Amino acid sequence: MTRVACIGECMIELKQAQGTGAGLFSRGYGGDTLNTAVYLARLGASTDYITALGDDTLSDEMIVGWAAEGVGTARVSRLPGKLPGLYMI
């Protein structure tokens, strides 16, 4: 089995929800290195993601989502008092 480690930053993505008024957003997460890790895992590669996140609820949700996609999270560092990056589209 192919083993891959992807290193990078994943960020929270806010996107205005279609068909809604201003101020309503859907939340996701993404980034080129995470997307690569997810697609490699879907193809059957043993994939780990190496990054740093905070110790907040959003970071917890990110890790749960990655694990659900089959991406290894054992190498994710947790930084007390920090938050993940955020961007809007």
Locate each region found by the language model.
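Secondary-structure boundary/capping motif
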Residues: T2-R3, V38, G72-A74
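Short, glycine/charged-enriched secondary-structure capping and boundary segments
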Residues: G19-A22, I63-G65
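Short pre-catalytic strand/loop immediately N-terminal to key active-site residues, enriched for Gly-Thr
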Residues: T20-G30
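Conserved N-terminal subdomain of the carbohydrate kinase-like
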Residues: S46-I89
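Positively charged, low-complexity intrinsically disordered leader regions
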Residues: M1-G19
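Beta-barrel outer-membrane channel/assembly domains of diderm bacteria
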Residues: I12-L14, S26, N35-L43
